[in-house]
């Protein structure tokens, strides 16, 4: 049964493209959406309640009172927190049910390992959810280990396969590579630069080009590294781009690179696959789930030599790169369409409401 006038309150960073897309997808499915956030940015059609800024992890402890007041005032039918160790904690303290929590990756893969206290707090938080979602099997399994009695489901962020679509291979000039990942240590952009510098560009016409999207705090150091490696004229530092900008860059590229040390299913990965690019990705469980088990195209994080070999293989075998790109597009159409994933999430919301019954 589809209800009308349903109210969804998202707790998360309103300046995150992922949360913004989630909000829009649920508006498109006739939900009234509000956001409680410590990092505001206007979202069309969404009422927003802003918390005091958070500058260190301990600050989340002091945002509980305001979060409770905002959630109580908004009176949502469902509370959905994005990122367990921050907004998930706030949602757990708000005690508004049904409560959904979505793990983003590091909140389960990294943060709980930092201390016994964070390990305990992660479990305490997750056990107060009515449903947990994650975008990789690894995250779902971890969530179930922390909170065995709480249902955990695999829901991907998904890619907009109508907008992120292939361009004809023959229209891609030379050998161009894209990275959509942030310029932060986890994503090893420095390793990518080192590997790119090893490509035999003297025999390539036009020379290979590396496009770096995503932006981040590492820009100055990365620009210096590119200069020191002698590749600054072949590396384009685009920074953060909107969807149209990303699509424009990806249209000229044959290969995408995503080599983080830690990650769940990356939206950047899915969008690159949707555009029909061959992908070189670090040997992580979430990446293997989407790309298979070819070790030659799945270097260990931080291994510049292995990454260079993978790029050289695709550079030398254009037919292989084209075939892998086509296979990637087909895989995302089958399992990674955003609309399909958000339909599944909306159905999970409905199940929670039916189980909860009328709110008194």
Predicted regions and their residues:
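Short His-centered aromatic/hydrophobic patch
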Residues: 81-87
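Short acidic/histidine- and often glycine-rich active-site loop of Leloir-type glycosyltransferases
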Residues: 101, 284-298
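Carbohydrate-associated surface elements
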Residues: 138, 158
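Conserved donor-binding/catalytic core segment of Leloir-type glycosyltransferases
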Residues: 170-197, 211
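Active-site donor-binding acidic/aromatic loop of nucleotide-activated sugar
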Residues: 218-221, 232-242, 249
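Aromatic "clamp/platform" in nucleotide-sugar-dependent glycosyltransferases that forms part
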Residues: 261
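Short hydrophobic beta-strand element within catalytic cores of glycosyltransferases
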Residues: 278-281
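Conserved acidic donor-binding segment of nucleotide-sugar-dependent glycosyltransferases
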Residues: 293-305, 313-318
């Amino acid at each position: 049964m589809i209800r009308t006038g349903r109210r969804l309150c998202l707790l998360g960073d309103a300046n995150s493209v992922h949360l913004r897309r989630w909000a829009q997808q649920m508006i498109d499915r006739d939900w009234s959406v509000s956001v409680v956030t410590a990092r505001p940015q206007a979202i069309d059609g969404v009422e927003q309640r802003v918390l005091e800024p958070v500058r260190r992890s301990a600050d989340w402890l002091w945002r509980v009172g305001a979060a409770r007041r905002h959630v109580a005032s908004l009176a949502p039918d469902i509370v959905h927190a994005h990122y367990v160790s921050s907004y998930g904690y706030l949602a757990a303290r708000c005690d508004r049910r049904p409560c959904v929590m979505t793990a983003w990756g590091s909140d389960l893969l990294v943060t709980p390992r930092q201390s016994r206290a964070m390990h305990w707090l992660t479990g305490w938080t997750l056990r107060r959810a009515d449903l947990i979602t994650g975008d990789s099997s690894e995250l779902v399994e971890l969530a179930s280990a922390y909170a065995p009695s709480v249902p955990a489901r695999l829901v991907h962020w998904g890619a907009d396969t109508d907008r992120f679509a292939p361009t004809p291979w023959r229209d891609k000039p030379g050998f161009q590579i894209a990275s959509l990942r942030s310029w932060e240590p986890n994503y090893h952009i420095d390793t990518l630069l080192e590997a790119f510098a090893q490509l035999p560009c003297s025999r390539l016409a036009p020379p290979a080009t590396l496009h770096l999207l995503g932006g981040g705090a590492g820009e100055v150091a990365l620009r210096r590294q590119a200069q020191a490696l002698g590749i600054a004229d072949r590396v384009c530092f685009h920074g953060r781009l909107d969807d149209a900008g990303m699509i424009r860059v990806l249209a000229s590229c044959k290969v995408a690179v995503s080599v983080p040390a830690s990650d769940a299913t990356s939206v950047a990965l899915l969008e690159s696959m949707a555009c029909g690019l061959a992908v070189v990705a670090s040997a992580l469980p979430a990446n293997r789930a989407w790309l298979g088990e070819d070790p030659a195209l799945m270097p260990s994080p931080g291994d510049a030599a292995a990454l260079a070999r993978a790029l050289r293989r695709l550079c030398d075998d254009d037919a292989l790169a084209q075939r892998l790109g086509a296979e990637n597009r087909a895989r995302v159409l089958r399992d990674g369409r955003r609309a399909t994933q958000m339909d599944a999430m909306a159905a999970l919301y409905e199940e929670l409401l039916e189980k909860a019954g009328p709110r008194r």
